[in-house]
C-alpha cells in the first residue's frame, strides 16, 4: 500500500521492483484521479475518474515505460501546475506481480467502498485470481484514423521533444514530454523559454488541446508570427484581444467560451494566406479574420512566408497535447 514507497530508501533493487519512490507530499487535497485502464479489476469500477480527498505522494525514480498505469493526475495536487503525477500502477517482476496505490492516508478513504474495491481488485490481480493488463502503455500520440485519412499528422509525438527546439538555445529547458503532454514548468523566480517546431508551414489547419493553471499565460503562434492568446481569464469573463482565444493585440474573440483553469480546452485554427479562423471549445470565435501583421513576441515580420508553430513558454506554466496539423494546398 501507500507507505511501502517510503521504505528501503537507498536500496535500488527495491525501488526498481516497486516502480517508484516517495519524495515528499504537500497538504491533503481534493484531486481527480484519472483512470488509465477502464478494464483493469483494480480501477474499472471508477469509470473515467475518481475524486478523493487525501494526502498525495510526490514520487521520484518513476518511469512510465516500466509500469502499467492505473490512476494518475495531470496536475500537481496542491499547486495545480500541469504535470504527470502517478497514483497507482501494476507491473510484473520475474514471475511475481506488483500492485501499488499511494491512496489511503485517511480513515474515510479506507471506509470508501470504491477505495476498498480498488485495493481488493489490485490484490486479486496480483494473486492471479483475475486477469488484467500489466504491460506499460504507449504514450506516443497518433491521430485518429478519420483524421489520418483527412491528412492530419502529429506535430508533437507525446513521448519526447523530437521535432521541436527552444527559441533561445541557451534558455531555460522548461519544456518536457510527460505522459502524452507537452509541459512547460517554470521554477519560481525563473524565466521560461518559447519552443518552436522544426517544420514550417504556410497554409494549414492545426488542432490542439491545452490546460492552463490559475493565473498563467501562454500563446499558440501560427507561422511563429500570429499569436492566439492563452490566458486564465475565466473569472474576468471579458472579451479582449489579450484574452483567451484572442488574436493578441489585434482582435478579441467574438464569444467568451473560456473554461476554468485546470480544465482541458480544445482549439482549431485555420490560416490561409492572411485569413485566420479559430474554434475554441467547439465555438467559432474568429471567422476568416484578416491578420496582415505580426502580433507581438513574434519570430519575424515575414507574414506571407511559411513559418513554424511556436508555443509561448516565457510567461507561465502550460500543458499541450494532441497537437496535429494538416497542410492546405
Region roles according to the model:
Residues 8-11, 35-39, 63, 82, ...:
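A structural signal for well-ordered alpha-helical scaffolds and beta->alpha junctions
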Residues 73, 93, 105, 210-212, ...:
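Short beta-strand segments enriched in hydrophobic/aromatic residues
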Residues 4-35, 43-52, 123, 130, ...:
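Carbohydrate-interacting regions of secretory-pathway proteins
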Residues 76-85, 92-142:
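Extracellular ligand-binding/catalytic regions of CAZymes and related secreted enzymes
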Residues 20-94:
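Catalytic beta-strand/loop cores that center a nucleophilic Ser/Cys/Thr
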Residues 1, 68-71, 98-102, 183, ...:
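Structural recognition of the beta-strand scaffold that forms the well-ordered cores
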Amino acid at each position: 500500500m501507500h507507505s511501502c514507497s517510503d521504505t528501503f530508501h537507498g536500496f535500488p533493487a527495491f525501488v526498481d521492483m516497486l516502480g517508484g519512490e516517495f519524495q515528499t507530499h504537500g497538504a491533503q487535497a481534493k484531486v481527480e484521479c484519472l483512470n488509465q485502464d477502464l478494464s483493469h479489476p483494480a480501477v474499472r469500477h471508477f469509470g473515467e475518474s475518481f475524486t478523493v480527498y487525501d494526502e498525495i505522494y510526490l514520487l521520484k525514480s518513476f518511469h512510465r515505460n516500466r509500469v502499467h498505469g492505473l490512476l494518475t493526475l495531470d496536475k500537481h495536487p496542491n499547486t495545480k501546475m500541469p504535470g504527470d503525477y502517478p497514483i497507482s500502477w501494476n507491473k510484473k517482476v520475474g514471475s511475481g506481480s506488483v500492485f501499488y496505490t499511494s491512496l489511503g492516508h485517511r480513515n474515510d478513504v479506507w471506509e470508501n467502498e470504491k477505495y476498498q474495491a480498488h485495493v481488493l481488485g489490485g490484490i486479486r490481480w496480483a494473486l492471479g485470481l483475475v486477469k488484467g493488463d500489466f504491460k506499460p502503455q504507449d504514450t506516443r500520440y497518433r491521430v485518429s484514423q478519420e483524421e489520418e485519412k483527412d491528412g492530419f499528422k502529429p506535430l508533437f509525438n507525446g513521448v519526447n521533444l523530437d521535432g521541436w527546439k527552444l527559441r533561445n538555445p541557451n534558455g531555460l529547458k522548461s519544456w518536457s514530454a510527460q505522459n502524452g503532454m507537452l509541459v512547460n514548468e517554470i521554477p519560481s523566480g525563473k524565466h521560461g523559454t518559447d519552443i518552436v517546431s522544426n517544420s514550417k508551414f504556410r497554409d494549414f489547419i492545426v488542432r490542439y488541446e491545452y490546460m492552463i493553471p490559475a493565473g498563467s499565460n501562454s500563446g499558440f503562434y501560427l507561422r511563429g508570427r500570429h499569436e492566439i492568446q492563452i490566458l486564465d481569464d475565466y473569472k474576468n469573463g471579458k472579451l479582449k484581444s489579450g484574452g483567451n482565444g484572442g488574436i493578441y493585440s489585434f482582435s478579441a474573440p467574438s464569444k467568451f467560451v473560456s473554461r476554468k483553469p485546470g480544465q482541458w480546452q480544445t482549439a482549431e485554427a485555420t490560416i490561409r494566406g492572411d485569413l485566420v479562423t479559430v474554434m475554441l471549445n467547439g465555438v467559432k470565435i474568429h471567422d476568416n479574420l484578416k491578420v496582415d501583421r505580426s502580433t507581438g513576441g513574434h519570430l519575424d515580420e515575414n507574414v506571407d512566408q511559411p513559418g513554424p508553430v511556436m508555443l509561448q513558454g516565457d510567461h507561465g506554466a502550460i500543458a499541450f497535447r494532441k497537437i496535429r496539423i494538416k497542410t492546405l494546398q
